[in-house]
Amino acid sequence: MKPNIHPDNYRTVLFFDSSANEGWLIRSCAGTHGKTMVWTDGKEYPLFSLDTSSSSHPVYTGKQRNVNTEGRASKFNQRFQSVMSSFRKDK
């Protein structure tokens, strides 16, 4: 890596997902607004709180809801059946 290309605030930051109780130490320039947290190694790091991450997002955890697409398609067809039938009669 080239020397002296990173901003002054490039440091190790703790990204912590409180809903999954999991965190990652990553070098970043992310603003932490003065929040810190003691990590498992006993050191205190700037803290960037996450609302969701790959540890808590339903798509990554496999707990997503399946949308009933058949029901939605049939509702669409019922609503626009008259429009479609008049369109077919005109041709």
Curated annotation (Swiss-Prot):
The keyword Ligase does not apply. One of its GO terms (biological process) is translation. Pfam families: Ribosomal_L31. InterPro entries: Ribosomal_bL28/bL31-like_sf, Ribosomal_bL31, Ribosomal_bL31_B, Ribosomal_bL31_sf. SUPFAM superfamilies: L28p-like (SSF143800). GO terms for molecular function: structural constituent of ribosome. PROSITE patterns: RIBOSOMAL_L31. Keywords: Ribonucleoprotein, Ribosomal protein. GO terms for cellular component: ribonucleoprotein complex; ribosome. Coiled coil: none annotated. NCBIfam families: L31, PRK01678.1. PANTHER family: 50S RIBOSOMAL PROTEIN L31, CHLOROPLASTIC, LARGE RIBOSOMAL SUBUNIT PROTEIN BL31C. Belongs to the bacterial ribosomal protein bL31 family. Type B subfamily. Part of the 50S ribosomal subunit. This is Large ribosomal subunit protein bL31B. It comes from Neisseria gonorrhoeae (strain NCCP11945).
